[in-house]
């Protein structure tokens, strides 16, 4: 019951709240009162990235200092993807306005790349529980790139993911992949990343 009242820090928070935000953005011309809801969400979104945990509810801090997320790649990608979809929609409906800074976004390309397992064939990822090794984070990487983060590591990562390698991907034969796949011709052969990384 407590989780249903307070899911801050969990990937479902951004899923539920940000999809509601996109719905509100689509209705703001017909229902002026939803503009206030949109702005409340926009102002609250950084709190999800900043969530420091909750000792009483035994909830971990969402992101560590190196940018790692405790829910591993699959669930981190899901929560981040939902947040970035709302952020892009907010920017598109608020031309010229400053969307504000979310410092954790800058560390995500490194995190997603450090928890993948490059190999011959499709990219594998380090996950836990009910996640599959084929799940990747190209959707969040594409949205980060679309938001102006032109990190070559993003291009490398996306170029390693095979088309159709998992069910939730942003692939070229799907609308989001068609719209947001960047030009991968300049993807580096190897990303400029440390050879090891600790997330804690």
How should each PLM-predicted stretch be described?
Residues 1-110, 116-117:
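Aromatic-lined, polymer-binding surfaces characteristic
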Residues 74-200:
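Carbohydrate-active enzyme catalytic cores, enriched for enzymes
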């Amino acid at each position: 019951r407590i989780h249903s009242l307070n899911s801050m820090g969990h990937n479902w928070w951004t899923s539920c709240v940000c999809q509601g935000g996109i719905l509100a953005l689509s209705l703001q011309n017909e229902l002026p009162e939803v503009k206030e809801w949109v702005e409340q969400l926009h102002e609250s979104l950084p709190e999800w990235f900043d969530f420091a945990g909750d000792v009483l509810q035994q909830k971990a801090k969402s992101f560590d200092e190196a940018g790692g997320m405790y829910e591993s790649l699959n669930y981190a990608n899901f929560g981040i993807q939902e947040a970035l979809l709302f952020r892009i929609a907010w920017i598109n409906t608020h031309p010229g306005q400053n969307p504000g800074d979310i410092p954790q976004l800058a560390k995500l390309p490194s995190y997603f790349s450090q928890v993948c397992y490059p190999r011959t064939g499709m990219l594998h990822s380090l996950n836990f529980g009910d996640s599959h090794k084929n799940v990747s984070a190209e959707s969040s990487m594409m949205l980060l790139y679309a938001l102006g983060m032109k990190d070559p590591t993003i291009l490398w990562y996306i170029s390693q993911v095979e088309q159709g390698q998992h069910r939730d991907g942003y692939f070229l034969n799907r609308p989001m992949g068609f719209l947001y796949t960047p030009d991968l011709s300049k993807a580096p052969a190897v990303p400029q990343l440390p050879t090891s990384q600790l997330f804690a």
